[in-house]
Amino acid sequence: MAATVPSLARAEQAPLPDKPFAEHRVVLQLSDNDPRKQGLVISVANNLLKFYDPDKVAIEVVTFGPGIDLLRPDNTNRKLVESLVAQGVRFDVCLNTVDSIERETGKRPEFVPVATPVQVGVGQILTLTENGYTLVRP
């Protein structure tokens, strides 16, 4: 089942993840729809979870521009994304991008229900880095 992302007017920047015991904080940027890059982002998140205990690392993947395709219901990586979310990784979808797609196509795209809508993907990255997250662009 897919979820339609709310409009920009109703969304806010997502609050920081609640990971009180996290010793490491990483934000992964995904801004293109290259399947190899999608796989690399998923691999980096998986490797971080294996290297650190999932309770010891906060991981947030921020998608914007063509990178939001990772969170579409028909993406081949859907089960991997859902598995990572079950382990505490958060996947954000940029609503500026969603609104642009809707203006261009006349249809609002759907995303996996585990996607967290944020108003501005780059703004979310800035908020996270200002709060101790390390930005990684695989």
Predicted segments with their positions:
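Secreted/extracellular ectodomain signature
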Residues: 8-138
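N-terminal export leaders
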Residues: 1-3
